[in-house]
């Protein structure tokens, strides 16, 4: 499935999502690896089959094998970390924040791509999954790597749009 086919799957009431998907595909704040890695990590995180198939097909034409794997790895590790750290952050019992996580996270040390790209993809997935602690942590790392607020915003706009498209398609299936 292509991006155009994905847009055609959306009902008329989701026209804004179609338009956002088109404009985000042409987004110039991010280079192709950052942009399409964000698209893929976001689609992988939401998991809706049509959304994932279309975005994966496009990403495969724009990303190296290493970047494809790293984008999926960002989604996978954030699927775990976002739940754990959201719990730590939201729990009234602050003792949990003093305990070691005791969860393997080796991919964070060596993601196989530029660290800033992996952080950006992790931020996008964290936004989808609603982990404020993770969002703050990744955003701070991105700033250290020199990314601008408009670059970070572009990634979150991609995540938001992919999430909304997946929700519409899931509801309409």
From Swiss-Prot:
The active site is at 131 (proton donor), 134 (cysteine sulfenic acid (-soh) intermediate). It holds the Pfam family CMD. Disulfide bonds join 131-134. One of its GO terms (biological process) is response to oxidative stress. Keywords: Antioxidant, Disulfide bond, Oxidoreductase, Peroxidase, Redox-active center. The keyword DNA-binding does not apply. It comes from the Bacteria. InterPro entries: AhpD (IPR004674), AhpD-like (IPR029032), AhpD_core (IPR004675), CMD-like (IPR003779). GO terms for molecular function: alkyl hydroperoxide reductase activity; disulfide oxidoreductase activity; hydroperoxide reductase activity; peroxiredoxin activity. It catalyses: N(6)-[(R)-dihydrolipoyl]-L-lysyl-[lipoyl-carrier protein] + a hydroperoxide = N(6)-[(R)-lipoyl]-L-lysyl-[lipoyl-carrier protein] + an alcohol + H2O. Its EC number is 1.11.1.28. Antioxidant protein with alkyl hydroperoxidase activity. Required for the reduction of the AhpC active site cysteine residues and for the regeneration of the AhpC enzyme activity. PANTHER family: ALKYL HYDROPEROXIDE REDUCTASE AHPD. Belongs to the AhpD family. This is Alkyl hydroperoxide reductase AhpD. The gene is ahpD.
């Amino acid at each position: 499935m292509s991006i155009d086919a994905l847009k055609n799957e959306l009902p008329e009431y989701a026209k804004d999502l179609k338009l956002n998907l088109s404009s985000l595909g042409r987004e110039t704040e991010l280079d192709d690896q950052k942009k399409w890695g964000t698209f893929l990590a976001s689609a992988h995180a939401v998991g809706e089959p049509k959304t994932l198939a279309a975005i994966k097909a496009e990403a495969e034409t724009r990303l190296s094998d290493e970047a494809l794997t790293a984008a999926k790895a960002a989604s996978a590790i954030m699927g775990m970390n976002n739940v754990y750290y959201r719990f730590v952050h939201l729990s009234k019992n602050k003792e949990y924040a003093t305990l070691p996580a005791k969860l393997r996270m080796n991919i964070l040390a060596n993601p196989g791509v530029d660290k800033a790209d992996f952080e950006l993809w992790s931020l996008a997935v964290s936004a989808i999954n609603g982990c404020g602690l993770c969002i703050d942590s990744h955003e701070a790392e991105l700033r250290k790597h020199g990314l601008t607020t408009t670059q970070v915003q572009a990634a979150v706009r991609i995540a938001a749009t992919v999430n909304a498209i997946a929700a519409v398609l899931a509801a309409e299936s």
